């Protein structure tokens, strides 16, 4: 497998949660411990870099030491947006890195198997993201009223880690910065560049913590897996 830098985006404001979801306890350990341990155990991950709030930098180093994380290379202060945080982390990656994986720190149940599978697809296609087929009906709306019903079979929800060829990713980030463009996720960055992104098979358990109900579900799922 190609050498992969695993970036954990953990500098968000957690405004919807009302508290720092990254360090919420799931069965006795911080939520972000899950991604750290999965990346540590993945054969394709060479180094881990965390983009964090300035007030959390030392806490991440302490957590890594407690968990026995040896791949952690840097903890950087994130920016105002996800893209700024990813760019700050990207600057710390080794020159020999061949793939860049960007993962939401608020997805605590990511597995080694998912990381390896998406990395393998990115190695083949240049860009890959884990995805799940949409299951709910999708409506386009305007001013609170339905405009049309979308063809659900053509839509997918995407997860992280999103993995990209390192050279392509660095180039895309540079172009976006020069153009003053800021994207909500890295897949959208590659869409802007016109590069196809492969949809890898996602994991229904790889949920994102956005509200209290997500924490309860994640805790239940993690109990089953231990």
Segments from the language model and where they lie:
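Residue-level signal for inorganic ion chemistry
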Residues: 8, 32, 89, 103-104, ...
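N-terminal glycine-rich phosphate-binding loop and ensuing alpha1 helix
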Residues: 1-58
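Conserved alpha/beta core of the MobA/IspD/sugar-nucleotide pyrophosphorylase nucleotidyltransferase superfamily
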Residues: 2, 156-226
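Conserved N-terminal catalytic core of the sugar/cofactor nucleotidyltransferase
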Residues: 33-97, 177-179
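Conserved beta-loop-beta/alpha segment of the NTase-like Rossmann-fold superfamily
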Residues: 74, 81-145, 159
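Hydrophobic packing residues within well-ordered alpha-helices of enzyme cores
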Residues: 17, 60-61, 118, 169, ...
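Residues at the starts of beta-strands that form the adenosine-phosphate
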Residues: 46-48, 127, 196
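Short aromatic/basic micro-patch
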Residues: 25, 109, 149, 163, ...
């Amino acid at each position: 497998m190609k050498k992969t830098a695993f970036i954990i985006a953990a500098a968000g404001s957690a405004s919807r949660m009302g508290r720092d979801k990254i360090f919420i306890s799931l069965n006795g350990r911080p939520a972000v411990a899950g991604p750290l341990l999965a990346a540590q155990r993945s054969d394709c991950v060479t180094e881990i870099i965390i983009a964090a709030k300035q007030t959390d930098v030392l806490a991440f180093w302490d957590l890594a030491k407690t968990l026995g994380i040896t791949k952690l290379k840097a903890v950087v202060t994130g920016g105002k947006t996800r893209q700024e945080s990813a760019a700050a982390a990207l600057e710390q990656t080794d020159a020999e890195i061949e793939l860049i994986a960007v993962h939401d720190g608020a997805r605590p149940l990511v597995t080694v198997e998912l990381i390896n599978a998406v990395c393998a697809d990115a190695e083949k296609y240049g860009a890959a993201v884990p995805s799940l087929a949409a299951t709910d009906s999708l409506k386009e709306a305007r001013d609170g009223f339905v405009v049309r019903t979308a063809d659900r079979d053509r839509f997918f929800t995407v997860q992280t880690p999103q993995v990209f060829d390192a050279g392509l990713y660095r180039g895309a980030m540079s172009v976006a910065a020069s153009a003053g463009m800021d994207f909500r996720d890295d897949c959208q960055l590659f869409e802007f560049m016109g590069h196809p992104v492969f949809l890898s098979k996602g994991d229904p358990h790889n949920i994102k913590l956005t509200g209290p109900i997500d924490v309860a579900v994640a805790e239940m799922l993690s109990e089953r897996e231990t």
